[in-house]
Amino acid sequence: TYCRRCIDFGRSDDNFVKFHINIPVSKIEAPKKPSVRLSDVQEVASERLVDNTRKALNTLVWAVCGAGKTEIVYEVIYQAILESKTICLAIPRRDVVKELSERFYRDFSGYPISVLHGEEKVLEESNFYIMTTHQLVKYYNYFDIVIIDEVDAFPYSGDECLENGAKTSLKNNGVLAFLSATPSNKIK
């Protein structure tokens, strides 16, 4: 038997052996701190996100389109890199994965970033990943922090398989952060 909802991820049944590998990452020189100008409100949101992450609290960053939600997560990503945590920025759409991976590579001074989506898999020796939400199902108990951008967007929103994949990709004390302009009541 197999799960009809999960068939898009490849067949997996009782005869399929599942395993988990921790990929060690050697010490990589930290990037220069990104120089991003935040408004006072963005600064407060960024500080709260960092603080909540340190306290292992899941967080919703709720702001209108164009309010700079991406810039708000720069500090938590930078701090995670400094603390050698494994972090993932997951987005439902691959075009946004491509756009953000170029932007983060530039803003984080060429720091290696693993980029994964349906058309591309660039695995770097790094603790920073940018991927589509579909890729999260392949990472069991792996990330310290998962940030899901556009959490309200298709195909992530309302897809139990993808939502569960995000949760199971986290380590035991892992933290989820959601970015959205229009979060569902379930996320709020």
Predicted regions and their residues:
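N-terminal pre-P-loop "Q-motif" helix
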Residues: P34-L57
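Conserved RecA-like ASCE P-loop NTPase motor core of nucleic-acid helicases/translocases
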Residues: K85-R93
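Loop/turn-to-beta-strand initiation segments
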Residues: K85-T86, P112, E125-Y129, Y142-I145, ...
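Conserved motor-coupling elements within RecA-like helicase/translocase cores
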Residues: E99-F143
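Post-DEXD/H (motif II) to motif III coupling segment of the RecA-like Helicase ATP-binding lobe
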Residues: F143-K188
